[in-house]
């Protein structure tokens, strides 16, 4: 329902499933695909039975699951205006739309692989500095058809999937965790969603480049 309501909000320019916007922007609501394991970043009101006990974050193969939408926001204690292009090297927050908790990591051990736990934390979009992730990509901006990595700004692990699979109550879902080593397991791509129209800033920069 949260995603549907965004479509009805005045002034938004939606591009669900289309590719006519080159850059990813603040305020966009997207699904993120781990390109190595073909699963989308997912969360739900199911808590880890070990580690932090916080809300679990997993990877799912379903394309249609509404629990895989994440809102792109500025880093903790900042505001990133809607439509602002995300620069490579910029710290951001990813807020789970349906529960209002932020993608988060800390020095707890993940339950299946023994890597660093990744959870969803906070209330109504507000958590702490451990919710910040730096976008790693080539070029000036995060582009929609490009692969990116997300580096945890505090602990420096990379958001990863290596294929470990949960049993009940979330049978078939893959573990998402943090890893220190860069590999094919930590590449992500923006897929379905509601993409905000890029701001005038990007247009102005493009104009100056042409001059």
Swiss-Prot record:
Top-rank taxon: Eukaryota
Signal peptide, first to last residue: 1-18
Keyword annotations from UniProtKB, A to Z: Repeat, Secreted, Signal
Predominant localisation class: secreted
Record's subcellular location: Secreted
Entry-linked InterPro entries: MIR_dom_sf, MIR_motif
PANTHER family, per the entry: STROMAL CELL-DERIVED FACTOR 2 (PTHR46809:SF3), STROMAL CELL-DERIVED FACTOR 2-LIKE PROTEIN (PTHR46809)
Protein name, per record: Stromal cell-derived factor 2
Taxonomic lineage from the root: Eukaryota, Metazoa, Chordata, Craniata, Vertebrata
């Amino acid at each position: 329902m949260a995603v549907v309501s965004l479509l009805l909000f005045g002034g938004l320019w939606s591009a669900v499933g289309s590719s006519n916007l080159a850059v990813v922007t603040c305020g966009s609501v997207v699904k993120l695909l781990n390109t190595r394991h073909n699963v989308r970043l997912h969360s739900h009101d199911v808590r880890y039975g070990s580690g932090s006990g916080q809300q679990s974050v997993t990877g799912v193969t379903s394309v249609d699951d509404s629990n895989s939408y994440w809102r792109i926001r500025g880093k903790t204690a900042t505001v990133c205006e809607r439509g602002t292009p995300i620069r490579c090297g910029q710290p951001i927050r990813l807020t789970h739309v349906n529960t209002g908790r932020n993608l988060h990591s800390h020095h707890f051990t993940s339950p299946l692989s023994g890597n660093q736990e990744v959870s969803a934390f906070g209330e109504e979009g507000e958590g702490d500095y451990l919710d910040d992730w730096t976008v790693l990509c080539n070029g000036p901006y995060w582009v929609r058809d490009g692969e990116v990595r997300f580096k945890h700004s505090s602990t420096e692990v990379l958001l990863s999937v290596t294929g470990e699979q949960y049993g009940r109550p979330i049978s078939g879902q893959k573990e998402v965790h943090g890893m220190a080593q860069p590999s094919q397991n930590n590449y992500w791509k923006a897929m379905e969603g509601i993409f905000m129209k890029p701001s005038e800033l990007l247009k102005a920069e493009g104009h100056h480049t042409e001059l």
